[in-house]
């Protein structure tokens, strides 16, 4: 008899309705991976920020959905179904089931862990829907998982340089350019979620993974395009990595260029892509005189993305080779023995035959 293989897809989660916005934000700001303060302070800060932020954020959720909720779970379910179908083809002798574990709203990681336990999985593969590794996202999700689930598992760290992943991005970008009427004088902005600078300084590989991915994408789009990386969704008073997406849009729009803007750290449509990239930054571009502004869609169920995820799961099961795209060492959840980050930066994108663990 074949194995029961559970694949757990991790993402941040989002409110189901407008009433969930404040408690969702409170969960987010209570996370020590997001607010690095000791407990009583963190809980107070979480209550304060979530209360202050909720009214504005509620309006943004309401722009996407009449009920005021996030499309993230719906989009993640589509990805889970597509991945499960692909894995069923690749592993015909086994039973594969995809589970969804959200960090700050339903289905919570604890709920997913209980489901996996109940199902009686023989193998558990942990798959973050965050292509780049950050302690604030993947790291936080995995620690919640290990608190909730006591069995063994195999962990995928990150996959920003996987061939199918890079080409899926290029494909989405070129499709958006076609839709925009193939303009000339293009500036492609590759926008990632920002991080506080202190997080990067403490060893988080997220920023260099975003920037190395951006270089790979830049190498495959028309040579006369300007390409730059920028960081969106800054929250709070700390210093964040930059340049900020909004400032880049203003700078480029002032030159009257055609802007294409693509998300490179989000793989599903949600508030940051539909509202921030789709609506708020469009107004900035218009105000500063951009010739045009076109938002590139998130990867969603793009076949290249689903095959990236399929390949990562097979690699985690020891059935395929993959790219080692992370820094290894202290932060790496896959348990790679690690080598100096600088050496790995050079190696990024080099196909190797070692498997994780
Ligand atoms: C204050 C700190 C935050 C850090 C650091 C952060 C990192 C980070 N987040 C994502 C992906 C997503 N973030 C989403 C929502 C969201 N994130 C923060 C704050 C931080 N994120 C807040 C306060 C919110 C809520 C919305 C808001 O108040 O603006 C979402 C889900 C949104 C949805 O539609 O449901 C995702 C996905 C990444 C990739 C990342 C760093 C690597
Ligand atoms: Fe976020
Ligand atoms: Fe890693």
From Swiss-Prot:
Protein name: Ferrochelatase
Reaction(s) the record says it catalyses: heme b + 2 H(+) = protoporphyrin IX + Fe(2+)
GO terms for biological process, alphabetical: heme biosynthetic process
Enzyme class: lyase
HAMAP family documented for this protein: Ferrochelatase
Annotated signal sequence range: none
Name of the gene this protein is made from: hemH
Listed GO CC annotations: cytoplasm
Source organism per UniProt: Hyphomonas neptunium (strain ATCC 15444)
Domain of life according to the entry: Bacteria
Record localization: Cytoplasm
């Amino acid at each position: 008899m074949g194995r029961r293989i559970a694949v757990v897809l991790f993402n941040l989660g989002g409110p189901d309705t407008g009433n969930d916005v404040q408690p969702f934000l409170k969960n987010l700001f209570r996370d020590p991976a997001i607010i690095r303060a000791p407990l009583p302070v963190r809980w107070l800060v979480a209550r304060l920020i979530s209360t202050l932020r909720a009214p504005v954020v509620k309006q943004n959720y309401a722009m996407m959905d009449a009920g005021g909720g996030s499309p993230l779970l719906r989009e993640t379910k589509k990805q889970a179904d597509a991945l499960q179908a692909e894995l069923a083809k690749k592993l015909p002798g086994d039973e594969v089931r995809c589970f969804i574990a959200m960090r700050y709203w339903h289905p919570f990681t604890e709920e997913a862990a209980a489901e996996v336990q109940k199902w009686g999985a023989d193998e558990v593969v942990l798959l973050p829907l965050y292509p780049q590794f950050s302690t604030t996202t993947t790291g936080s999700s995995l620690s919640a998982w290990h608190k909730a689930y006591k069995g063994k598992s195999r962990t995928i760290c990150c996959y920003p340089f996987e061939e199918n992943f890079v080409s899926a991005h290029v494909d989405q970008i070129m499709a958006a350019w076609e839709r925009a009427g193939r303009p000339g004088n293009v500036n492609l902005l590759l926008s990632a979620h920002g991080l506080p600078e202190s997080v990067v300084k403490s060893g988080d590989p997220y920023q260099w993974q975003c920037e190395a991915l951006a270089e790979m994408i830049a190498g495959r789009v028309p040579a006369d395009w300007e390409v730059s990386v920028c960081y969106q969704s800054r929250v709070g008073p700390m210093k964040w990595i930059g340049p900020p997406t909004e400032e880049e849009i203003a700078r480029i729009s002032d030159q009257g260029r055609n802007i294409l803007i693509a998300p490179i750290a989000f793989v599903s449509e949600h508030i940051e892509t539909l509202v921030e990239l789709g609506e708020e930054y469009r107004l900035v571009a218009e105000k500063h005189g951009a010739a045009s502004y076109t938002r590139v869609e998130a990867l969603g169920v793009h076949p290249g993305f689903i095959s990236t995820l399929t390949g990562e799961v097979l690699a985690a099961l020891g059935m395929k080779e993959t790219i080692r795209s992370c820094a290894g060492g202290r932060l790496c959840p896959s348990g790679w023995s690690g080598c100096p980050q600088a050496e790995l930066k050079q190696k990024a994108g080099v196909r190797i035959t070692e498997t994780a663990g």
